[in-house]
């Protein structure tokens, strides 16, 4: 197994952990301030977009290396 491929797998796991932490923060914030849901939702979509961008860059690198 190539160590580069292992590093890319670890990066993808980091993306999953990052999304989980983001959603955890969103749920806690909405539980405290339910009236701010629309503002939190827009910020959540922006955060998920950046996190998923990292995942897709990692996916492209894995295809290039393979």
Swiss-Prot record:
The record marks 52 as: Reversibly protonated during proton transport. It comes from the Bacteria. It is found in: Cell membrane. Inhibited by dicyclohexylcarbodiimide (DCDD); activity was higher at pH 5.7 than at pH 7.5. The keyword Membrane applies. The keyword 4Fe-4S does not apply. GO terms for cellular component: plasma membrane; proton-transporting ATP synthase complex; proton-transporting two-sector ATPase complex, proton-transporting domain. Its main location: membrane. The chain crosses the membrane at residues 3-23, 45-65. Induction: Induced by a decrease in external pH from 7.5 to 5.7. Keywords: ATP synthesis, Cell membrane, CF(0), Hydrogen ion transport, Ion transport, Lipid-binding, Membrane, Transmembrane, Transmembrane helix, Transport. F(1)F(0) ATP synthase produces ATP from ADP in the presence of a proton or sodium gradient. F-type ATPases consist of two structural domains, F(1) containing the extramembraneous catalytic core and F(0) containing the membrane proton channel, linked together by a central stalk and a peripheral stalk. During catalysis, ATP synthesis in the catalytic domain of F(1) is coupled via a rotary mechanism of the central stalk subunits to proton translocation. Key component of the F(0) channel; it plays a direct role in translocation across the membrane. A homomeric c-ring of between 10-14 subunits forms the central stalk rotor element with the F(1) delta and epsilon subunits. Belongs to the ATPase C chain family. This is ATP synthase subunit c. It comes from Streptococcus pneumoniae (strain ATCC BAA-255 / R6).
């Amino acid at each position: 197994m190539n160590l580069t491929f292992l590093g890319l797998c670890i990066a993808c796991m980091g993306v999953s952990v990052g999304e989980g932490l983001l959603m955890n923060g969103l749920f806690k914030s909405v539980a405290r301030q339910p009236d701010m849901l629309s503002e939190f939702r827009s910020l959540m979509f922006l955060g998920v977009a950046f996190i998923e961008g990292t995942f897709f860059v990692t996916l492209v690198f894995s295809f290039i290396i393979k």
